[in-house]
């Protein structure tokens, strides 16, 4: 099995982004969703990205953003990858001249394979915990046994991951990548650098 990639999401400060990169994170995530306690402004994201070394993937997370809002952000912020975390259709995720991943919130009874197949142009699917009315970042894990084998897209596992459980999650799910936000925080939007290091070390 090739090395599992890691993304640290919900970055709001330069020092947290640099700590994640130094620890070995492959990607840094920025939340462009005003209702999130981890939301960043265009200027915040631009400043953080400008401080990053090369070969770090920058990801923008969006939740049911309008085409106008999304276009304005993409014109201003150099994002490598888009992550759609709302009810966006495949057509709404396409056409931005950037690869995208689609987040799917998992609950018992879902046909995850069919949901994955509904986004044929996606670079991957991110599986997160379903909580009513909350698009993501809940800090809660879901039942990994619900994930079917042989999904048509690379699988990014999210939802309640921590330095303590991520190695077990990888062994059981065998994802392409793991995504963490709350599991490496001191408080919402503020990362704990020791937890980031512990998480990345556990992924390896």
From Swiss-Prot:
GO biological process terms, semicolon-separated: L-tryptophan biosynthetic process
Keyword vocabulary terms for this entry: Amino-acid biosynthesis, Aromatic amino acid biosynthesis, Isomerase, Tryptophan biosynthesis
Keyword Membrane: no
InterPro entries cross-referenced by the UniProt entry: Aldolase_TIM, PRAI_dom, RibuloseP-bd_barrel, TrpF_fam
Superkingdom: Bacteria
Pfam families: PRAI
Enzyme superclass (EC): isomerase
Catalytic activity: N-(5-phospho-beta-D-ribosyl)anthranilate = 1-(2-carboxyphenylamino)-1-deoxy-D-ribulose 5-phosphate
Entry-linked CDD domains: PRAI
Catalytic activity, EC: 5.3.1.24
Pathway where it operates: Amino-acid biosynthesis; L-tryptophan biosynthesis; L-tryptophan from chorismate: step 3/5
Molecular function terms from GO: phosphoribosylanthranilate isomerase activity
Family note: Belongs to the TrpF family.
Database matches in PANTHER family: N-(5'-PHOSPHORIBOSYL)ANTHRANILATE ISOMERASE
Name of this chain's protein: N-(5'-phosphoribosyl)anthranilate isomerase
Organism the protein comes from: Pseudomonas fluorescens (strain Pf0-1)
Gene: trpF
């Amino acid at each position: 099995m090739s090395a599992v990639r890691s993304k640290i999401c919900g970055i709001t400060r330069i020092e947290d982004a640099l700590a994640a990169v130094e620890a070995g994170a492959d990607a840094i995530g920025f939340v462009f969703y005003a209702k999130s306690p981890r939301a960043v402004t265009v200027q915040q994201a631009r400043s953080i990205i400008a401080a990053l070394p090369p070969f770090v993937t920058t990801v923008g997370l969006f939740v049911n953003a309008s085409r106008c809002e999304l276009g304005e952000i993409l014109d201003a912020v150099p994002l490598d990858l888009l992550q759609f975390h709302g009810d966006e259709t495949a057509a709404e995720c396409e056409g931005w001249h950037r690869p995208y991943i689609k987040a799917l919130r998992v609950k018992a009874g879902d046909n995850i394979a069919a949901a994955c197949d509904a986004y044929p142009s996606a670079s991957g699917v991110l599986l997160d915990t379903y909580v009513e009315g909350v698009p993501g970042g809940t800090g809660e894990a879901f039942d990994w046994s619900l994930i079917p084998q042989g999904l048509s897209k690379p699988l990014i596992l999210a939802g309640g991951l921590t330095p303590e459980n991520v190695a077990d999650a990888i062994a059981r799910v065998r994802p392409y990548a793991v995504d963490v936000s709350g599991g490496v925080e001191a408080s919402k939007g503020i990362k704990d650098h020791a937890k980031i290091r512990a998480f990345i070390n556990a992924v390896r």
